[in-house]
């Protein structure tokens, strides 16, 4: 009998998102700030993404570092975000952090909620 080890796919933190986080952290003047991404119940598709800045990191958080800044995800949210890409986009609809999530079966028109 063989045992297989499963390693979850990571979370991609793009150059554009890292640069925006870096700019916002510099504006605040607090180098301890990290972008926290989380998933909560709600939205038109069942789950919704949330973003906040946080100084604290829990022992079981996943941390993705890029270009001197950090993205933090709690374990409950990570199970929905494994393999996803966190990006920052500017366009006619405004500018925002966006998540491209291969785990999402459906998403709403604005892209802030999804279902599995």
Curated annotation (Swiss-Prot):
GO-annotated cellular components: cytosol
GO terms, molecular function: 2 iron, 2 sulfur cluster binding; 4 iron, 4 sulfur cluster binding; iron ion binding
Entry keyword Ubl conjugation: no
Disulphide bridges: none
Any one GO biological process: iron-sulfur cluster assembly
Keyword Iron-sulfur appears in the UniProt entry: yes
Cofactor note: Binds 1 iron-sulfur cluster per subunit.
Record-linked PANTHER family: IRON-SULFUR CLUSTER ASSEMBLY 2 HOMOLOG, MITOCHONDRIAL (PTHR43011:SF1)
Subunit field text: Homodimer.
Protein's recorded name: Iron-sulfur cluster insertion protein ErpA
């Amino acid at each position: 009998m063989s045992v297989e080890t499963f390693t979850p796919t990571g979370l991609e933190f793009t150059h554009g998102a890292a640069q925006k986080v870096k700019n916002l952290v510099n504006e605040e003047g607090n180098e301890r700030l990290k972008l926290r991404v989380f998933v909560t119940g709600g939205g038109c598709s069942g789950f919704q993404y949330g973003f906040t800045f946080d100084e604290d990191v829990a022992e079981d958080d996943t941390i993705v570092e890029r270009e001197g800044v950090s993205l933090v995800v709690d374990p409950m949210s990570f199970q929905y975000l494994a393999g996803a890409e966190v990006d920052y986009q500017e366009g006619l609809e405004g500018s925002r952090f966006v998540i491209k999530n291969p785990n999402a079966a459906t998403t709403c028109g604005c892209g802030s909620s999804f279902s599995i």
